[in-house]
């Protein structure tokens, strides 16, 4: 369906259901659609002298301003009683009453938060927004509240020309096997090994923790397994920093967003980084959207709820095992009319497995594998 068809479908369904979930790909325009639905309800239910109460839930404090900007951008909401609150503070609204509740990025509704939500008396409508809702949460709202779910994933959005199809450049790399500079501990001794040797060593440790967990169901082993796997992906990202700096230099005249593995890596790869640690993050984002700067780097803060203007290139220095995070990150780039995604990755590693999952929804014609950054053409 086109954007207009989904918009009309949602408007036609909102009068017949109290709970609606808009499961739409990042970049689709969920906030605008939610604002239109709110105003439709206001026109249908409330008289001129009445003012509906609206609660909008967001995942982070920075997203409160994003919603204020969106409301202003799309002509306002027909109410003076609008509360924008973070999910962390939802418990403060237990047993409260609102005419309309909007749950932005509703994947943040944990079981405990859903319990609080169930105590809120919603007079007219609950509207959930997400590109990445989990199946069990979707099923809960369908079975408990007969929720109407309207979906549009990445593949459908591209096929129906709701979003542009990006050109995806894959840049396969090989771990070095000749230079001995990496230290690992084996049999209680420090051993100097190669890049490939270090990767194999940490992978063996991950498998050991994993097997220990499945044999014992010891939660400590599970935590060690998952945390070490995360450290492995972070290490892989760090090995690509020199390459990414070359990419940023090559595309210095194009608006580029680089996804990093940590705040520290965001700082190393970009002067204008957007992180929870950087007090200038909001200013950097504004300058980027106003085209005053070309490059920004980020780790997690740009995964959701933040709008980017005309970003042409997305560089995935860090690969994430979370399908939710991957979809959110790709959505940051698909607002440009001809987006480019560049994914450098190490062959025969966990990264290669993640890349294969990432590109499943793209057509084969849009994926180009290159041997050198010089082969990437815009």
Give the residues covered by each predicted segment.
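Conserved pre-motif I regulatory segment
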Residues: 1-23
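Interdomain linker/hinge connecting the two RecA-like lobes of the SF2 helicase core
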Residues: 18-21, 154-255, 260-261
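Conserved Walker A/P-loop ATP-binding site and its immediately adjacent core
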Residues: 26-41, 48-71, 113, 262-264
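Inter-Walker segment of RecA-like/P-loop motor cores
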Residues: 57-97
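Conserved helicase ATPase core of P-loop NTP-dependent helicases/translocases
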Residues: 65-69, 255-259, 264-306, 325
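A short beta-strand element within the Helicase C-terminal
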Residues: 98-102, 295-299, 303-320, 325-326, ...
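Post-DEXD/H (motif II) to motif III coupling segment of the RecA-like Helicase ATP-binding lobe
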Residues: 108-168
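Conserved segment of the helicase C-terminal RecA-like domain
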Residues: 332-360
């Amino acid at each position: 369906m086109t954007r207009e068809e989904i918009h009309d479908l949602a408007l036609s369904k909102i009068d017949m259901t109290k709970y609606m979930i808009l499961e739409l790909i990042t970049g689709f325009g969920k906030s605008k659609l939610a604002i239109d639905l709110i105003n439709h309800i206001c026109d249908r239910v409330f008289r001129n002298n009445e003012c509906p109460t609206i609660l909008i839930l967001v995942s982070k404090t920075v997203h409160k301003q994003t919603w204020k900007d969106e409301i202003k951008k799309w002509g306002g909401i027909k109410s003076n009683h609008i509360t924008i609150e973070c999910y962390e503070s939802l418990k403060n609204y237990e047993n409260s009453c609102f005419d309309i509740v909007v749950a932005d990025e509703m994947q943040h509704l944990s079981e405990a938060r859903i319990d609080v939500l169930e105590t809120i008396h919603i007079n007219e409508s609950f509207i959930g927004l997400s590109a990445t809702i989990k199946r069990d949460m979707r099923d809960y709202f369908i079975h408990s509240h007969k929720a109407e779910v309207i979906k549009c994933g990445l593949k459908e959005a591209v096929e129906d020309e709701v979003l542009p199809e990006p050109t995806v450049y894959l840049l396969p790399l090989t771990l070095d096997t000749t230079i001995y500079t990496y230290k690992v501990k084996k049999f209680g001794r420090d051993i100097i090994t190669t890049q490939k040797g270090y990767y194999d060593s940490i992978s063996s440790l991950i498998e050991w923790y994993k097997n220990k967990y499945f044999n014992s169901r010891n939660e400590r082993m599970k935590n060690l397994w998952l945390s070490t796997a995360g450290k492995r992906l972070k290490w892989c990202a760090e090995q690509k920093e020199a390459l990414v700096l070359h990419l940023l230099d090559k595309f210095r005249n194009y608006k580029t967003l680089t996804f990093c593995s940590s705040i520290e890596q965001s700082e190393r790869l970009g002067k204008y980084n957007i992180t929870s640690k950087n007090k200038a993050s909001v200013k950097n984002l504004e300058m980027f959207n106003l085209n005053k700067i070309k490059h920004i780097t980020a780790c997690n803060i740009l995964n959701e709820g933040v709008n980017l203007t005309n970003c042409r290139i997305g560089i995935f220095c860090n690969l994430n095992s979370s399908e939710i995070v991957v979809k959110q990150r790709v959505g940051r780039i698909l607002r440009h009319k001809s987006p480019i995604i560049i994914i450098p990755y190490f062959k025969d590693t966990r990264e290669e497995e993640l890349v294969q999952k990432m590109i499943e929804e793209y057509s084969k014609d849009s994926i180009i594998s290159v041997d050198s950054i010089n082969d990437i053409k815009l």
